[in-house]
Amino acid sequence: DVDRAAVVTGSGELLNRNNLIAVLSVIVISEHPGTTIVTNSPTTEHLKKFIMKLGGHQYRYISGYRNVINKAIELNNQGTDCQLAIETSGHAAFKENYFLDDGAYVVAKILMLLPRLVAKGETLDSLIKKLVQPKEVVEVRFKIGTKDFKATGLEVIKDFPNWIPKDWVVNLENEEGVRIDFKGEYGDGWL
């Protein structure tokens, strides 16, 4: 039903997840400087810095394509310009396209970007090289085996920050679970 899209670059690199969000961010921020981009929560700090360097803002929200779209609509109604709602899954919706979840529209926007890149001697690959890539990406989902899994999950979320090492930090810019940022001998990252 073409509600999602992914693109393969000239070098064969798959343009999805953070990379797809980065490319679409280049497009919307060039057209709407200072705009906010709503994403779901499992995006990297590298992506946030990439968006900020372009002059935009990222708003991390809970997963679910309808959730990010509704948050973008809400932000616009509150006076915050938000031109793009996108999940790492590839679901993306542009304000100019009535926030429809439309993969074909995403591909069309990227195709329209290509001549501008060529004119500057760039490619999608060179654009993505500007986004720092994580050394490792592992997504783990825990199954809660208790009868009242919701209550157990909420209790774990509440207590988890008490169990982290002192040099790790709770990232408050997160509305889904608990996001912990860490730096040190094992690298920089988040969980």
Region spans (language model):
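Short glycine-rich anion-binding loops that position phosphate/pyrophosphate groups of nucleotides
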Residues: 1-4, 89-91
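Short, basic/hydrophobic alpha-helical segments
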Residues: 25-31
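Short Gly/Thr/Asp-enriched flexible loops that form oxyanion-binding sites at enzyme active sites
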Residues: 3-20, 47-48
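Phosphate-binding and adjacent anionic-ligand microenvironments
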Residues: 11, 32-191
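Alpha-helical metal-binding/catalytic segments enriched in His/Glu/Asp
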Residues: 18-24, 107
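Acidic side chains
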Residues: 1-3, 18, 40, 101-102
